[in-house]
């Protein structure tokens, strides 16, 4: 189980291959890659900046990952989340889950990204033609995370 918060980009294919090579019990792998969009709520986005609270963010991601491990029989998981300034089409986040069977891999991957979007302490600002604006939490993200409440 690996969590990395980093400024530099990542190679998703390499990361998945490396994760699978560690464990021959894996029968299914699911991944999610989040990208910077060029539009948000109808506005053009020139760039996005993500900030985080060093130490607190890592602890929260560990808790989220532990919750997934309590719910599904995962063999491996990987969360890579970037911070800093990124432009449209750049990768932001990679979530990979691996299990003996596909159902656990699919469900846990969806759970991790839903909870990461709402429970991990990242702050996002966007550069638009109007200037730099802080992005508020979206109700749709909260609803997606709420469906996983026990």
Feature-to-residue mapping (PLM):
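N-terminal, polar/charged subdomain of small-to-medium soluble alpha/beta proteins
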Residues: 1-92, 106-110, 114-150
